């Protein structure tokens, strides 16, 4: 064997011994310096990395590629139903079926569990406390997005999550011209479902990830409860550069970069709010919307009997670029 061939084999062996750097193989991490993430979880800038199967930053940090949902190794402690029973679900989302709620009868426990089954890492990663915090954080963020509560509401404002299933009074079709995710004629991409999925550039990749054409059928997010929950879980589980996935944050798989730390973005529930709506809610001191998200989170953690963790707000965090 020639010296060059021997070097190549040794280099390959060293490479294989190092953990993957990005994408689904690395908890949804993105590559530094706008490099592409290959289908195999490695960073680079050639067609081997940026071509077919590229997971993120396929055209640099300006876009390209389809965000990939990470599927971390489950802890082996059972599915999400082992963390949240039907009775607990009903207690947490106490007034979702109130007669005044637009979504009455829509958000069912069975749909929640079925959707979670399509994302094996959701609510199954890490210790029991980590799993509980993930479910609490997910339901808190989505409860804020769909809340029907008010300050003097029966049982408190934080008992009224999941009251709405679609945006009220939408005045835009939320269509951004895109060759990759073209809008269908006559369709609107306003907020729907638990996370209030908006814009064609989110409906497109969400639909591809769950196997449904949501560009042509966006109303499914407000008419099929399992599809609805799946879109929210897709958003939760999927890193979109430069943001990590909410799942990676709450399960402790995200390590903030120096840039993140300089911006005040450190692990905790607060950075998830930054991921969801940081451009509007974070970085300018106290904000009632951030406080509302925290209120839901604390209530759900209390019901699940788990600690809140640190860094709950994003008042002093700069939004992700």
Curated annotation (Swiss-Prot):
Keywords: Antimicrobial, Carbohydrate metabolism, Chitin degradation, Chitin-binding, Disulfide bond, Fungicide, Glycosidase, Hydrolase, Plant defense, Polysaccharide degradation, Signal. It catalyses: Random endo-hydrolysis of N-acetyl-beta-D-glucosaminide (1->4)-beta-linkages in chitin and chitodextrins. The keyword Transcription does not apply. Changing residue 145 to Q: Abolishes chitinase activity towards insoluble and soluble chitin. Abolishes chitin-binding activity and anti-fungal activity. GO terms for molecular function: chitin binding; chitinase activity; endochitinase activity. Residues 1-19 form the signal peptide. Residues 80-321 are annotated as: Catalytic. It holds the Pfam family Glyco_hydro_19. Residues 20-60 form the Chitin-binding type-1 domain. Optimum pH is about 5.0. Stable between pH 4-8. GO terms for biological process: cell wall macromolecule catabolic process; chitin catabolic process; defense response to fungus; killing of cells of another organism; polysaccharide catabolic process. The active site is at residue 145. Its EC number is 3.2.1.14. GO terms for cellular component: extracellular region. Localized in the aleurone cells of the seed endosperm (at protein level). This is Basic endochitinase A. It comes from Secale cereale (Rye). The gene is rsca.
